[in-house]
Amino acid sequence: MAQAKKKSTAKKKTASKKRTNSRKKKNDNPIRYVIAILVVVLMVLGVFQLGIIGRLIDSFFNYLFGYSRYLTYILVLLATGFITYSKRIPKTRRTAGSIVLQIALLFVSQLVFHFNSGIKAEREPVLSYVYQSYQHSHFPNFGGGVLGFYLLELSVPLISLFGVCIITILLLCSSVILLTNHQHRDVAKVALENIKAWFGSFNEKMSERNQEKQLKREEKARLKEEQKARQNEQPQIKDVSDFTEVPQERDIPIYGHTENESKSQCQPSRKKRVFDAENSSNNIVNHQADQQEQLTEQTHNSVESENTIEEAGEVTNVSYVVPPLTLLNQPAKQKATSKAEVQRKGQVLENTLKDFGVNAKVTQIKIGPAVTQYEIQPAQGVKVSKIVNLHNDIALALAAKDVRIEAPIPGRSAVGIEVPNEKISLVSLKEVLDEKFPSNNKLEVGLGRDISGDPITVPLNEMPHLLVAGSTGSGKSVCINGIITSILLNAKPHEVKLMLIDPKMVELNVYNGIPHLLIPVVTNPHKAAQALEKIVAEMERRYDLFQHSSTRNIKGYNELIRKQNQELDEKQPELPYIVVIVDELADLMMVAGKEVENAIQRITQMARAAGIHLIVATQRPSVDVITGIIKNNIPSRIAFAVSSQTDSRTIIGTGGAEKLLGKGDMLYVGNGDSSQTRIQGAFLSDQEVQDVVNYVVEQQQANYVKEMEPDAPVDKSEMKSEDALYDEAYLFVVEQQKASTSLLQRQFRIGYNRASRLMDDLERNQVIGPQKGSKPRQVLIDLNNDEV
């Protein structure tokens, strides 16, 4: 029986399992999933207004819920997912919170719409509204929709508009509480704590401000008390009103001021003071006249006592006319650089930079006489050094001889890439001076044209000294000739004087005989050192004149002389500017380096105010020629093409001159400039120089100042030496053009000490140069010298 019962119960269990499985199969109907997917698709179409169906769905929800329809979309999607997977309608706390939030948003949307445009009494039917919305392809603002409209329409008469606002806030708070599972008590507690914290911080800030104000008030009160204490400590001074005869203001005479004169006329009680003031003013005028006469006498005495430039009889030549620009050749028309070719190279440049990962654009192109500058604007984040390192790659891509990169261009957020032109355009001195001729500044000289093609002229008196250096054939001598010719075209002989030193003997001899020269062109290196010392003496004499005349510089002194000549009807000569030009400094430094360096140092340090300006040129820019003393005292420099970056640094302090093209291509650094200016130098032919010199000489002959001429060099043959072999050693060294102690030992079979003494005597008598390490000594006298 027991076994039969067990079998029957087992059969019942299997039958119940079958029934539940069949029910599950019935409940797992796939139609539910299809409906869920369809609802999701329709909601997505409605949210994004996709097609006709999407637009109709969104119009329908807009009509019912207004702006709150987007929450409705979310709630429908969440409810669909919940029903699909849990197979029941959601009856949870979050469901109630979502419904409350939907109602609150209906109120909010309708309230916003109400405050903006007021309540509308009528609504269109749903179908007509949907059709109209689709037909006009727009979705008008319906606030909270039909539901929000009727909710507000029913609530306002019952609890007023203010009550509706309060109910809306409560609904929003309730929905948040239901969704987050927080009780009202907790929310209120957190809100109260936040409010208390805010009020606490506010009170702290206010108390801090009050304390600061209190401290300021106390500080002001303390300062006032200190002021009163100081006033009490000072001796008591009677009030101004107690003095009847003394005016309230001090009667300080201001000469040349009409107000004091009017006061003296209307106040008879001050007759004595006015009389004293008039006497003192007369005394001052008389004292000034006496001082002027004394100054004139001192000037005459200084002129009479010293041998000066004016003593040479330099008279202002009224009939002298500066040479016209027509003496210079008219520049010939040259073929301009093709703009299409330049633009093509700019595009190639951009592509090349892009190939190497540099994002940059060509923003501007400047076509100059010798080079074309491409302004590159790098993108944000691009390092400038990355562009500079592509120097060789850019030159290769553009098929250029060399490329100079200026990174960045001073004063601009751009990088300049200078590419040589296929043909250098000739720049003439006439076209450079044409715009500023004649110049008011007598020392205005023309250099050439810059990268933009603009003419560059610079005043020598603002430089105030100039260093010109470059290798042979780079255009250095042409630049010197252009500077001298510019002075001849601007200044008369009594305005500017020149001293030319040319150890090479061939560059500046053409200027012999012009009236602007102080002395003939100096070609002997020994005389050159003495000539520079004469300039130093002239500088000291001028400063002595400035001291006696109470002037500071040559400009003030000349103005004083002109004023005296007008008042006293005299003809005192004005001081002319002096420009000293040394064409080859290296030769002078080898012969008399110490004397030349000392003279150049004194001239460059002090001669600016005296109207003396120095131009030094050399083709060997080494540190033993351009020493640190010379370099530091000559702020303006011109660098022509050099062979190495070291030479460029010696001249202008930075590299760049080694990349110049030659033929007048230069880098100019002015006084106070932080960057170089690339200039194509102005060309001047020998015939043009000769024409200007002939024009000047025909009007006035040279009147040299004998006192400025250097002394004749000492005859080396007359110098005595204690050694009997000195004359033979002298002739031997001059014939062989080399000298050393061992050579004299072998030639004359003498000991080392005697040979060393002979070498010292030869060096002292300036037959050989000083010793320079392991290098052989230079013989300073050749066989062509008559003294030998």
Curated annotation (Swiss-Prot):
Organism, scientific name: Staphylococcus aureus (strain Mu50 / ATCC 700699)
Subcellular location, record wording: Cell membrane
Translocase as UniProt keyword: no
Gene3D superfamilies: 3.30.980.40, P-loop containing nucleotide triphosphate hydrolases, Winged helix-like DNA-binding domain superfamily/Winged helix DNA-binding domain
InterPro entries reported in the protein's UniProt record: AAA+_ATPase, FtsK/SpoIIIE/SftA, FtsK_alpha, FtsK_dom, Ftsk_gamma, P-loop_NTPase, WH-like_DNA-bd_sf, WH_DNA-bd_sf
Family: Belongs to the FtsK/SpoIIIE/SftA family.
Gene Ontology biological process terms from the UniProt entry: cell division; chromosome segregation
Gene Ontology cellular component list: plasma membrane
SMART domains: AAA (SM00382), Ftsk_gamma (SM00843)
Cytoplasmic side, ranges: 179-788
Transmembrane regions: 34-54, 63-83, 99-119, 137-157, 158-178
Keyword tags: ATP-binding, Cell cycle, Cell division, Cell membrane, Chromosome partition, DNA-binding, Membrane, Nucleotide-binding, Transmembrane, Transmembrane helix
Domain FtsK intervals: 453-649
Record remark on domains: Consists of an N-terminal domain, which is sufficient for the localization to the septal ring and is required for cell division, followed by a linker domain, and a C-terminal domain, which forms the translocation motor involved in chromosome segregation. The C-terminal domain can be further subdivided into alpha, beta and gamma subdomains. The alpha and beta subdomains form the DNA pump, and the gamma subdomain is a regulatory subdomain.
Physiological role: Essential cell division protein that coordinates cell division and chromosome segregation. The N-terminus is involved in assembly of the cell-division machinery. The C-terminus functions as a DNA motor that moves dsDNA in an ATP-dependent manner towards the dif recombination site, which is located within the replication terminus region. Required for activation of the Xer recombinase, allowing activation of chromosome unlinking by recombination.
A Pfam family matched in the record: FtsK_alpha
Name of the protein this chain belongs to: DNA translocase FtsK
Binding residue positions for ATP: G473, S474, G475, K476, S477, V478
Membrane topology: Multi-pass membrane protein
GO function terms (MF aspect): ATP binding; ATP hydrolysis activity; DNA binding
Main location group: membrane
Disordered: region residues: 1-25, 209-244, 253-272
Recorded superkingdom: Bacteria
Oligomeric form and interacting partners: Homohexamer. Forms a ring that surrounds DNA.
Extent of Basic and acidic residues compositional bias: 209-231, 253-262
